[in-house]
């Protein structure tokens, strides 16, 4: 069973420009979540949904349509496997394993053109609403 650990160092600038650092550790089993997703009728699953952070997995089969709408929060995609393109605000970017993409809030975007199964982790800078 493969576990991915995401360690995020968060830096806060408080009043008076004092710096505070803390470590946020999230443990999740992406294989388990992807296997559940493959058996469902959906192509994405949010497994952590907090007020300030949402994390989930996206899985698209070759040719499957990505119908997502712009989100109210900034989003980061980490490509786990596959290929294709990510269309962000009228520009397309080729995607491949281990690449990271940032999409600002309220910006139209979608994946397309994958000839292999495409799986990605996504992180919202807020809840997945």
Regions found by a protein language model. Name each.
Residues 56-71:
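Conserved short histidine dyad/triad with adjacent acidic residue
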Residues 67, 76, 90-93:
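Short, surface-exposed secondary-structure edge patches
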Residues 105-129:
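Ligand-binding loop in jelly-roll beta-barrel domains
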């Amino acid at each position: 069973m493969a576990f991915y650990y995401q360690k995020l160092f968060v830096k806060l600038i408080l009043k008076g420009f004092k710096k505070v650092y803390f470590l946020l550790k999230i443990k999740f089993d992406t294989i388990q979540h992807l296997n559940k997703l493959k058996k469902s009728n959906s192509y994405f699953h949010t497994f952590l949904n907090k007020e300030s952070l949402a994390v989930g997995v996206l899985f698209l089969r070759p040719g499957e349509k990505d119908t997502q709408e712009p989100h109210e929060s900034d989003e980061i995609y980490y490509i786990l496997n596959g290929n294709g393109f990510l269309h962000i605000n009228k520009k397309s970017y080729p995607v491949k394993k281990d690449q990271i993409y940032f999409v600002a809030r309220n910006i139209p975007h979608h994946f397309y053109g994958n000839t292999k199964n495409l799986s990605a982790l996504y992180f919202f800078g807020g809840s997945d609403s």
